[in-house]
């Protein structure tokens, strides 16, 4: 367990500071002060670390969305808040964008996302698509996850602003789940009224602290300062 803790601590630091693709296994082993065989026995590969971290991060996002939402908000609004948070987090730091995009690119983490999200989508949007089974929602999630990956991959600029990205994504994804146009408009207007960058910054720090608490490692100033570029 001590070796696993050191590896996770090293990966959180290196992934945040350098990105997933910018971090090598050799750098992780050196930072964690473990042998190559220990790393392979615990995680097998860098993808194994990503899977474990991603599972925790995605679960934490749903919890964070509930703290942002008002008590009377609909499940569809909660979905909009959670997905808007994820898109905004990837705009805070290109290395975080790299982590999230990779999570949507590797078979193991993609399948985790599909399966864990399907039940949530069925609960949220089942009333909009009453004839659909969980299997149907699994198939829809494959498509909506592809939309999410595409929008995360493309960074914002002076023309394609965060607000435009959120509006485009939410209109497309809510349409997939048969949310009526007037309700989509109300949800999108509400999201655009929120200071999503400030909310996402706060949520990001909470998520990383939750990671530290869950995997029992200490955060330091370097990790904290690297979160938001």
Where are the predicted features?
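Short, hydrophobic secondary-structure boundary micro-motifs
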Residues: 97-102, 183-186
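An amphipathic alpha-helix adjacent to DNA-recognition modules
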Residues: 4-9, 21-22, 42-66
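Pre-recognition alpha-helix immediately N-terminal to the DNA-recognition helix
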Residues: 6-14, 85
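Hydrophobic alpha-helical connector segments
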Residues: 52, 63-96, 106, 114-118
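Helix-turn-helix
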Residues: 14-48, 52
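C-terminal peripheral helix-coil segments that are non-catalytic and often amphipathic
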Residues: 123, 127, 157-229
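Amphipathic alpha-helical packing segments from all-alpha helical-bundle domains
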Residues: 104-156, 160-171
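The short coil/loop that forms the "turn" connecting the two helices of the helix-turn-helix
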Residues: 2-3, 34
